[in-house]
Amino acid sequence: MAVFKLIKPAPLTEKVQSRQGNIYLYRAMWLIGWIPPKEGVLRYVYLFWTCVPFAFGVFYLPVGFIISYVQEFKNFTPGEFLTSLQVCINVYGASVKSTITYLFLWRLRKTEILLDSLDKRLANDSDRERIHNMVARCNYAFLIYSFIYCGYAGSTFLSYALSGRPPWSVYNPFIDWRDGMGSLWIQAIFEYITMSFAVLQDQLSDTYPLMFTIMFRAHMEVLKDHVRSLRMDPERSEADNYQDLVNCVLDHKTILKCCDMIRPMISRTIFVQFALIGSVLGLTLVNVFFFSNFWKGVASLLFVITILLQTFPFCYTCNMLIDDAQDLSNEIFQSNWVDAEPRYKATLVLFMHHVQQPIIFIAGGIFPISMNSNITVAKFAFSIITIVRQMNLAEQFQ
């Protein structure tokens, strides 16, 4: 486990920053070509590599799927077509999401600078322990996403290639996989590499919102601890107590600035996913229920898990962030303010008023990002299954 030492909290004697929760995330970004060197010849070599995953994952795959449907539609079995179509729809969404994420990477960097200022406010070992646990939790979550996303790509590749078919049936102008076993495996490996670009780009677009909201929640917990300790030290003067309150207000403003900095980025990527999740999930479940054998079913179920992971954990964290604001308001009200000076009380009232406004992210300026919204858009999957059952479409396509 030494290879993945970042998934365990570092000892309190070791200095840890919030941004270290993104170490695995940024390593994956570096691998896919999103973080070039700042200068030197290697920067230009690296920029060429940046273009390769974009060329295949963002541009070639969406076009390749459509050409394949036009030229090879009559050769598809129902299961192969659904496997290809469910991924095709998701690939279009992933192309948009990864492009948005890449163009707005500067927002992540600026958010980390704001988080650095919050790290400086850690007052004791309890605060540091929360941040250490958060850093480990973020890296652990990214690792789980990596295993599941890569597991889907690998299982689909093997289940179809071993059955004598290309995994996603993407158009390839240079190879006809029907020419023999060698051509089949060349096509399958080419599709796997190309799809791996898209899968990793999609993973990066899906994980950064979760990573950063986990960080925001950790600092909200630290802030709640600081609010609980207000005016609890009898040795501190009223001026010191007032400064402690002001620091809490400033910390809350910094957390709001973090959310505002990353909000336009999250709004766009989650809106794209909300728009697609129902149809992709529905087609995948139809494929599992009616057209898959065991191993292809395993690959499709892994795809279902990846689709659910794209939004559900983040939406749950958004719900918790809303609850954190309410909890913080309660902590402020229950703090030791009764015999405080008028200036302290006036500032406390204003602080509590601002805290009562929950931190909400809006997808595309339309859907509040929450578990309720996620479940609502995901319900469309069951509508697709109902239509297939009532019209006996599965039997007609057998």
Swiss-Prot record:
Matches recorded under Pfam families: 7tm_6
Extracellular side: 68-84, 163-179, 291-293, 370-398
Residues annotated as glycosylated: 374
GO biological-process terms attached to the record: detection of chemical stimulus involved in sensory perception of smell; sensory perception of smell; signal transduction
Main location: membrane
GO CC field: dendrite membrane; membrane; plasma membrane
UniProt GO MF annotations: ionotropic olfactory receptor activity; odorant binding; olfactory receptor activity
Record's keyword terms, sorted: Cell membrane, Glycoprotein, Membrane, Olfaction, Receptor, Sensory transduction, Transducer, Transmembrane, Transmembrane helix
Membrane topology: Multi-pass membrane protein
Keyword Cell cycle: no
Alphabetical list of InterPro entries matching this protein: 7tm6_olfct_rcpt (IPR004117)
Membrane-crossing residue ranges in chain numbering: 47-67, 85-105, 142-162, 180-200, 270-290, 294-314, 349-369
Leader sequence segment: none
Tissues expressed in: Expressed in olfactory sensory neurons in the antenna.
Hydrolase recorded as keyword: no
Cytoplasmic-side segments: 1-46, 106-141, 201-269, 315-348
Subcellular location: Cell membrane
Function (record text): Odorant receptor which mediates acceptance or avoidance behavior, depending on its substrates. The odorant receptor repertoire encodes a large collection of odor stimuli that vary widely in identity, intensity, and duration. Forms a complex with Orco to form odorant-sensing units, providing sensitive and prolonged odorant signaling and calcium permeability. Also plays a role in the response to N,N-Diethyl-meta-toluamide (DEET), the most widely used insect repellent worldwide.
Subunit: Interacts with Orco. Complexes exist early in the endomembrane system in olfactory sensory neurons (OSNs), coupling these complexes to the conserved ciliary trafficking pathway.
Family that this chain belongs to: Belongs to the insect chemoreceptor superfamily. Heteromeric odorant receptor channel (TC 1.A.69) family. Or2a subfamily.
Miscellaneous comment: The atypical heteromeric and topological design of the odorant receptors appears to be an insect-specific solution for odor recognition, making the OR/Orco complex an attractive target for the development of highly selective insect repellents to disrupt olfactory-mediated host-seeking behaviors of insect disease vectors. Odor-evoked OR currents are independent of known G-protein-coupled second messenger pathways.
Protein name from the UniProt record: Odorant receptor 59b
Organism from which the protein derives: Drosophila melanogaster (Fruit fly)
